[in-house]
Amino acid sequence: MEAALNIASPSLPGVMPGQLEFTTSAAAKVSELIVEEGNPNLKLRLYVTGGGCSGFSYGFAFDDQTAEDDTLIVTEGVALVVDAMSLQYVLGARVDFEDGLEGSRFVIHNPNAQSTCGCGSSFSV
């Protein structure tokens, strides 16, 4: 069962649960990585920056801090954090973890992306 819960979004108070999905497979992988890091306070931060071959790039980092205007999505007890600027580009997206022939990686299925590059790490809106 996939779950998404918006705990707090001061920057976009109208954001409803499910408008940004953090899948159980992504949460399970993040949980494994948190155990490896040995810091139970870590959260996966998703951010969008300018650059990449299509205009914007996705990035992920572990963070044990949250800002007042961050949006926090919790699935299976694991938190995904998105800053206010990045949130506008990923609303409606699904953050997933895929393990396949091309390797293991976090993937963002973003309906807002008008085009993406071949590797899937950059997009345009």
Curated annotation (Swiss-Prot):
Q: Which cofactor does it need?
A: iron-sulfur cluster
Keywords (A to Z) from UniProt: Iron, Iron-sulfur, Metal-binding
- Role played: Required for insertion of 4Fe-4S clusters.
The protein's matches in HAMAP family, at most eight in alphabetical order, are given as: Fe_S_insert_ErpA
> What is the species of this protein?
Polaromonas naphthalenivorans (strain CJ2)
A single Gene Ontology biological process assigned to it is: iron-sulfur cluster assembly
Determine the domain of life of the protein's source. Answer: Bacteria
In the record's cofactor note, how is the cofactor described as bound? Binds 1 iron-sulfur cluster per subunit.
- How does this protein assemble? Homodimer.
Source taxonomy: Bacteria, Pseudomonadati, Pseudomonadota, Betaproteobacteria, Burkholderiales
Q: What is this protein called?
A: Putative iron-sulfur cluster insertion protein ErpA 2
Binding-site positions, iron-sulfur cluster: 53, 117, 119
User: Which GO terms label this protein's molecular function in UniProt?
Assistant: 2 iron, 2 sulfur cluster binding; 4 iron, 4 sulfur cluster binding; iron ion binding
The UniProt family comment states: Belongs to the HesB/IscA family.
GO cellular component assignments: cytosol
